Amino acid sequence: MAEQETPQFNIELPEEVGQGQYANLAVVLHSQSEFILDFVRLLPGQQSARVHSRQILTPDNAKRLVRLLEQHLACFEQ
């Protein structure tokens, strides 16, 4: 069986996105066709929080994200 090649492509990272957004809480919702990840900043002593980023993924991409996070967490813990 021939080895599958990973497609190569360029990824552009705009400066305002590259600075990132701090989040200390994540909320996950899902439907039959998508996973929604809301990243929230919850400040101490506050009764409300604000979603700072929402990412919408297909189930396949959500599975890929889980695998990547597991790999990186394993490396981090070594």
Q: Where do the model's predicted regions map?
A:
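N-terminal intrinsically disordered, cationic/polar leader segments
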Residues: M1-D60, R67-Q78
